[in-house]
């Protein structure tokens, strides 16, 4: 009996260390949000479609500022919120990226004020932002880049925000809306 107890105690201790190690690895392994400044460093060449410039000229870049207006505060109030629009989690959830994510998952250059920036659609970038990974689609996707394999996948992503939960919802015409923000790399 004594011997048996000794063995099971060792088993328990072994299991504990095995699993506690796993959870440490998992928690430290999630990609974090690096912010548009980081993506923009490499994606601002005109010959490659200057994604940074296209985004800066889009309403997505102003989505946070929109929440700082009197119009936004009125919308929030009419919906029964007691806080200013820019302090209301529901509004922030569509007008920014990672508003409800732990600070440890946001890099130094990440700014909530940047509104609906690159990682809103492409996914948190700390693990795929390296040039060698970015150039290899499969590696980038494995490192967290959203895989936009067809139009339906893209439209689904848009509709996570462009839907009836938006207080100012306008019917979402995907073709027209994508044209307004398209930032493809020009084909040679
Ligand atoms: C160190 C430079 C660098 C950084 C930083 C970087 N990229 Fe890239 N990215 C590239 C290169 C190089 C390519 C390959 C295409 C090309 O030559 O422009 C690429 C390709 C892409 C593609 C197309 C990949 C595919 O397989 O479909 C997307 C989308 C993209 N980047 C988004 C981002 C986002 C979002 C960020 C920020 C989180 C980012 N990139 C940060 C250099 C970079
Ligand atoms: C994270 C949420 C989010 C996602 C995902 C998103 N959008 Fe938006 N989009 C917004 C918000 C918020 C606004 C309004 C910004 C403002 O006016 O301040 C907006 C505005 C726009 C506008 C300007 C509309 C106008 O009235 O002028 C276009 C075009 C647009 N989005 C296209 C797209 C497309 C296409 C996709 C998918 C590829 C997409 N969006 C994905 C949140 C999102
Ligand atoms: C489900 C996502 C979502 C939520 C939640 C959301 N918005 Fe928006 N917001 C959008 C999108 C997308 C647009 C672009 C217009 C549309 O809905 O088609 C937008 C546009 C706006 C505009 C610009 C008005 C216009 O006509 O273009 C204001 C102001 C605004 N939102 C305020 C708010 C406030 C305040 C809240 C919180 C009470 C809020 N939004 C919550 C997605 C959202
Ligand atoms: C509203 C969503 C959204 C935002 C914001 C956004 N993108 Fe994209 N991006 C897409 C989608 C969807 C595609 C895929 C288009 C396709 O396959 O036709 C794409 C494609 C790309 C590509 C590859 C283009 C190609 O032709 O292969 C690059 C590079 C890229 N985005 C970089 C960026 C960068 C950098 C930012 C921020 C400055 C950004 N994107 C912001 C949705 C977005």
Mark where each language-model region is.
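Bacterial N-terminal signal peptides
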Residues: 8-21
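Functional cores that coordinate and move charged inorganic groups
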Residues: 120, 165-166
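Positively charged n-region of N-terminal signal peptides that target proteins for export
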Residues: 1-7
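Alpha-helical multi-pass transmembrane bundles of energy-transducing inner-membrane proteins
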Residues: 154, 158-161
């Amino acid at each position: 009996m004594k011997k048996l107890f000794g063995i099971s105690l060792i088993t328990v201790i072994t299991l504990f260390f095995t699993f506690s190690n796993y959870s440490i690895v998992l928690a430290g392994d999630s990609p974090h949000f690096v912010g548009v400044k980081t993506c923009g460093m490499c994606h601002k060449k005109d010959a490659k479609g200057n994604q940074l410039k296209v985004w800066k000229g889009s309403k997505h870049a102003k989505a946070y500022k929109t929440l700082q207006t009197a119009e936004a505060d009125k919308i929030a109030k009419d919906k029964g919120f007691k806080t200013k629009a820019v302090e209301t989690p529901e509004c922030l959830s569509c007008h920014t990226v990672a508003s409800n994510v732990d600070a440890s998952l946001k890099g130094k250059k990440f700014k909530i004020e940047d509104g609906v920036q690159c990682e809103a659609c492409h996914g948190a970038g700390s693990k795929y932002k390296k040039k060698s990974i970015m150039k290899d689609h499969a590696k980038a996707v494995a490192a967290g880049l959203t895989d936009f394999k067809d139009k339906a996948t893209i439209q689904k992503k848009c509709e996570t925000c462009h839907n009836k939960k938006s207080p100012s919802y306008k019917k979402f015409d995907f073709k027209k809306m994508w044209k307004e923000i398209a930032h493809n790399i020009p084909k040679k």
